[in-house]
Amino acid sequence: VIREEYEELEERLLSPLATLSKNSKGRAVPEEKDPYRTDFQRDVDRIIYSKAFRRLQYKTQVFIAPKGDHYRNRLTHTLEVMAISRSISRSLRLNPDLTEAIAVGHDLGHSPFGHAGEEALNNKVKEYFSDMQFVHTEQSLRVVDLLEKRTRSDGNEVFGLNLTYEVREGIAKHSKGLKDLKDFSTDALPSTLEGQVVRLSDRIAYLHHDLDDAIRAKIVKENDVPKLVKNVLGDNNSKRLSTLILNVIEESRNKKRITISEEVEKAMDEWKNFLTEKVYVGSEPKKEEEKVKIIISFLFDYYMENIQKIKDYLYSHPIILQTKDPVSYLKENKREQVRVIADYISSMTDRFAIELVQSIMFPNPIS
């Protein structure tokens, strides 16, 4: 069996600190082992073949509806996180398949319009129920556990990708600001080093590509980059990326935690503050945020009043496992209706959300 040969190879080649595929804590619903893929390789494939993964190409990273083909979107961000985390994992002799699975799945629950969309959706959810929230890390886990459909080898469709514990935990803990999730420990860091690699790689990726895109958009110039960042990390973006990756590798070798040096940490914080001031808050993308709030708020309120308008979506949503008449059921259960509408809107691409608002407001456009 090819899988068993590969598992033996992992045991021989990977670090004692790596997470071996054969030692996975397994899946919520036990499955037969695949003859040629390890559990983590199988998870990579399940995520890449999912609809949620394909939709990432039409979701904003920072620049909403950018004029140009070379700006990052949520899919290219995901691929860059995967590339960085894989480089670090291989150098540290960690499990590259586990790293890759977490990386490709980490943003599956992201809303349209980037973090502006996430904030708008969170505010809208809280408007209806103050104790509810929308956070993309939790939604990413909800996507892989519940919302995404897959076809089993017997031809039957089921809800949820049924990923391994380690991949699910890595997805849930890839970002700061996470509420405790009942399935995982309350420690903010993933328990696997591979999960920690992805968490740090996510940060490295967005610092690198958000600056690159901001320079391309002429929002900032290379000369504007703070001196501390240049002195510590390098005088161009390519050099800075290499410095960060090498620093993670050097500082984390043979350690039970993935880390960076104090000097580099300070430089990264300075870089983030610079982007926040010049790009995230004080520039063109920020001006677009008001439009995002209007779009998300309009759609949310519209579907709270007209839940029957998404009847087709409801019949492909796991709510159908609870009731044969989801429209009537949700009209009686407002809390669940809020969650389902958040599921629906967060699954949208930027362009679909914009076109939807236009079609609702102007059903018969003047020709």
Please give the residue ranges for each predicted region.
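Histidine-centered, transition-metal-coordinating active-site segments
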Residues: 1-78, 82-88, 95-96, 117, ...
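Active-site alpha-helix of zinc metalloproteases
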Residues: 101-102
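Short active-site segment of divalent metal-dependent hydrolases/proteases
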Residues: 105-113, 205
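A generic membrane alpha-helix/interface feature
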Residues: 111, 124-125, 220, 367
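A glycine- and small-aliphatic-rich helix-loop capping segment at beta-alpha/alpha-beta transitions
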Residues: 114-127
